[in-house]
């Protein structure tokens, strides 16, 4: 169908293509559609199939041309992308540049469209990479094991009424609260009922955990809260608020005893409390190794990305912003548009920490995917089976069920890609030179502060 095409690369990893379609193709499709109309059209005064072509054209020419135009463009795009190696991004549709396109049956038809494609860049050979990574020495003591045991104790506790009826640290309380104006009138839009939280554990929006300690059921109290200028919620930062709070219920956790029976209740695999502690220790050691690998990979990607200029298309950035927004919206109340505004406020290359983090994550994803695509290794059927067996052992779901899931959902391709990604990551890790760092506690290590 395509008579000729001109392709031009634009900034932002965009492709501009000019497509020309022969007038003969246009005329053929137009005449075919005209004949189809003629055979089916019903017009008063004429039998079906006997309406003169001239009358059909006079009455329906614009509609016929519009139909042919749409078909020609759609078929041209299909043909173009079937042969063109620079594919469009799945979340960015091609855009036709011309407005009010019209067909002239006596001339070849030409139209221009623009689309965003995967950015082109080169990654260095792993064997040529010389990167040193300082990895801290992590020490694990009994308190780390005890903390995990305490978490399991809380998870397996029962919530019961607190007969003392007084709010204290760790009480589970249900409250009604509302903001008050200067005249102590309720600001209805801020009213919240049956809000449940654990005193001293939950980070409430208004941060009134400590203010309810000592209150009793059905007690009502008006408090004043002053918020620092860099308070975690911007809309409250630097403000003074009056709040009316009413306690509706006070409960507590009935914690099980930590003994051999407790361990058995956690899982049949544990016969004693020591069995449970040994399992937790092994899990902590595995977690430390995973975090160390993540630290090394972060160092690798940050070092490589600093040396690479990647012309990232806007739609790819938009998709990454939405991912970051979903993670961030749990901690703030801003809309997606407000979040995007923060990102774009000073352009792509500003020094804003949010922007730097999002672009850095995106560049890392692009680099690893490029390395996966270029790596010649093939994922075998045995590799697939081994991964499914591993998932079966970790999840408790049978191998047959996992295999059926991947096949039914057409996810085998993605599983292969994930397996290959892990193989490439192992190659990267093997290429890095580890330097012994300072000694840190397990708690400090897992909070990722040392990984910044």
Swiss-Prot record:
Keywords: Cell cycle, Cell division, Chaperone, Cytoplasm, Isomerase, Rotamase. SUPFAM superfamilies: FKBP-like, Triger factor/SurA peptide-binding domain-like, Trigger factor ribosome-binding domain. It is an enzyme of class 5 (isomerase). Residues 170-256 form the PPIase FKBP-type domain. GO terms for cellular component: cytoplasm. One of its GO terms (molecular function) is ribosome binding. Its EC number is 5.2.1.8. Involved in protein export. Acts as a chaperone by maintaining the newly synthesized protein in an open conformation. Functions as a peptidyl-prolyl cis-trans isomerase. This is Trigger factor. The lineage of its organism: Bacteria, Pseudomonadati, Spirochaetota, Spirochaetia, Spirochaetales.
């Amino acid at each position: 169908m395509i008579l000729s095409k001109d392709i031009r690369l634009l900034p932002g990893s965009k492709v501009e293509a000019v497509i020309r379609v022969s007038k003969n193709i246009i005329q053929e499709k137009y005449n075919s559609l005209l004949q189809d109309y003629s055979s089916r059209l019903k017009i008063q005064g004429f039998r079906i199939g006997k309406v003169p072509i001239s009358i059909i054209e006079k009455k329906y020419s614009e509609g016929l041309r519009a139909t042919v135009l749409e078909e020609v463009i759609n078929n041209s795009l299909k043909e173009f992308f079937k042969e063109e190696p620079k594919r469009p991004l799945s979340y960015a549709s091609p855009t036709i540049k011309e407005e009010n396109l019209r067909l002239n049956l006596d001339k070849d038809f030409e139209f221009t469209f623009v689309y965003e494609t995967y950015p082109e860049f080169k990654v260095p050979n792993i064997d040529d990479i010389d990167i040193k990574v300082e990895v801290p020495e992590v020490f694990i003591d009994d308190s780390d094991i005890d903390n995990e045991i305490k978490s399991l104790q809380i998870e397996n506790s029962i919530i019961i009424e607190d007969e003392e009826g007084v709010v204290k640290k760790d009480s589970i309380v249900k409250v009604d609260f509302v903001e008050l104006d200067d005249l102590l009138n309720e600001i209805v839009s801020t009213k919240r009922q049956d809000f449940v939280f654990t005193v001293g554990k939950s980070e409430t929006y208004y941060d009134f955990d400590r203010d309810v300690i000592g209150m009793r059921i059905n007690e009502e109290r008006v408090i004043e809260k002053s918020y620092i200028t860099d308070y975690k919620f911007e809309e409250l930062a630097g403000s003074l608020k009056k709040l009316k709070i009413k306690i509706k219920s006070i409960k507590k956790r009935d914690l099980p005893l930590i003994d051999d029976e407790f361990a058995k209740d956690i899982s049949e695999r544990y016969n004693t409390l020591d069995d449970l502690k040994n399992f937790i220790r092994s899990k902590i050691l595995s977690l430390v190794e995973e975090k160390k690998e993540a630290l090394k990979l972060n160092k690798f990607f940050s070092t490589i990305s600093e040396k690479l200029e990647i012309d990232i298309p806007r739609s790819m950035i938009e998709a990454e912003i939405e991912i970051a927004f979903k993670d961030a919206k749990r901690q703030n109340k801003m809309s997606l548009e407000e979040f995007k505004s923060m990102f774009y406020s000073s352009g792509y290359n500003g020094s804003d920490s949010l922007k730097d983090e999002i672009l850095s994550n995106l560049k890392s994803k692009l680099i690893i995917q490029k390395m996966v695509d270029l790596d010649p290794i093939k994922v075998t059927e045995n590799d697939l089976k081994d991964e499914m067996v591993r998932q079966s052992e970790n999840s408790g779901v049978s191998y047959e069920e996992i295999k059926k899931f991947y096949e039914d959902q057409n996810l085998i391709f993605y599983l292969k890609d994930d397996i290959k990604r892990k193989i490439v990551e192992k190659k990267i890790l093997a290429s890095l030179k580890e330097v012994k760092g300072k000694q840190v506690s397990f708690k400090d290590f897992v909070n990722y502060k040392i990984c910044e």
